[in-house]
Amino acid sequence: MSKWTPAADEKNQGTLEFEIARAQVEEGLEQAFQRNKNEVSIPGFRKGKVTKQLFFQKFGEEALYQQAMDIVLPAAYEAAIDEAGITPVGRPNIEPVSMNKGEAWTLKAVVKTAPAIKLGEYLNLEVEAQDEEVADADVDAEIKRLQDGQAELVLQEESVKAENGDTVVIDFDGSVDGVKFDGGQGKDFSLALGSGQFIPGFEEQLVGHTAGEDVNVNVTFPEDYQAADLAGKEALFEVTIHELKRKELPELDDEFAKDVDEEVETLAELKEKTSKKLADEKAQAAKAAFEDAVISKAVDNASVDGDEIPAEMIDEDVHRQIDQYLGQLQQQGISREMFFQISGQTEDDLHKQFEEGAETRVKTGLILEAIVAAEKIDPSAEQVSEEVASLAAQYNMEEDKVRAAISESMLKHDIAMREAIKKVTDSAKAV
């Protein structure tokens, strides 16, 4: 049983008083006892063989209260906020009211809540139709991309002058005011001219030169250069061009078509297949853009009480996005530490990156939740089972492990949000 009392002097905050039933308390105490009994020594008993009754006689059940609380509190708190119908923001401040022996426990939580949402029009919306047409130029550009992918780098004679798009193999030795700096030297480095691999102005000064030449390249490091001791400074790079290589493209003919796609026999067939592939991709992109536009309009039509999203909600979203992103990298074998080392980014950099758009994401989520409530969307047990099966297949997990990792309320929440999006977008019309 829970009781929600809004704060009189502060918006979007209140006190939630709730009970943990005695049966749940007993279960928590039992689990806590099982975790500790192997560490307890009592004369006359081997380690791990002491009974719970004797343990309580010697130490009192209060000795296990904190561990038992840690075990039972998450589910009890979640049930209490569900019963109260509130959406908490951030971590609550929870304190015990009473924890008497043999009785249910009563707790009090000071909770910040999400702001109230006033929905506007969200059904039968009209948004601009998305372009799904595939032009000949689109097909030609894709064929050109495939052609570039089949290109070969061919070594050129020394008389050939370098052009943008060529690759040069160089040695370079950089200095500032005659003093060499870390990272300013390299040997047999392959540099594609025009790629922007080096600082602005470097690659352009190699255009027009030939293999065998020594070239002095004068540049100025950008003011925001990552190495602060070089930022804004003029530098000289002494460069030796060893080799010049130029892309040679294959002929666009039937043989080329067969090389890039074994399922076709002619260039005409490749173009037709490419056109169909692009049409499918464009249709999917148009569908996604249409849905985004519809949801965006529904969000614009709604309003947030106080016109402000709590900072805690934005911070929660940013951390969730970061954890999800780093978790995906972890699945690819890239640890958190490895990512920061490879990318050169810091946690603050990543936080700033995901801060962009966080307020819109949070507001969209709040409005979709309001639509779920307004439309009385309540996923069935069958839908939850289907969701569990889908997640189990996606992550190659057993279904019971999925249920252990994700609460039923969270599963239902995710399903309901998708149902809300579908209801809004299905009712919309492209004009």
From Swiss-Prot:
GO molecular function, one term: peptidyl-prolyl cis-trans isomerase activity
EC category: isomerase
Subcellular locations according to the entry: Cytoplasm
Catalytic activities: [protein]-peptidylproline (omega=180) = [protein]-peptidylproline (omega=0)
SUPFAM superfamilies named among the record's database cross-references: FKBP-like (SSF54534), Triger factor/SurA peptide-binding domain-like (SSF109998), Trigger factor ribosome-binding domain (SSF102735)
One GO BP: chaperone-mediated protein folding
A single Gene Ontology CC term: cytoplasm
Paired cysteines (S-S): none
Documented EC number(s): 5.2.1.8
Domain of life: Bacteria
Entry keywords, A to Z: Cell cycle, Cell division, Chaperone, Cytoplasm, Isomerase, Rotamase
Keyword set includes Phosphoprotein: no
Main location: cytoplasm
Pfam family, one: Trigger_C
All copies of domain PPIase FKBP-type, residue ranges: 165-250
NCBIfam families: tig (TIGR00115)
Family classification: Belongs to the FKBP-type PPIase family. Tig subfamily.
Role, per record: Involved in protein export. Acts as a chaperone by maintaining the newly synthesized protein in an open conformation. Functions as a peptidyl-prolyl cis-trans isomerase.
Domain text: Consists of 3 domains; the N-terminus binds the ribosome, the middle domain has PPIase activity, while the C-terminus has intrinsic chaperone activity on its own.
Entry protein name: Trigger factor
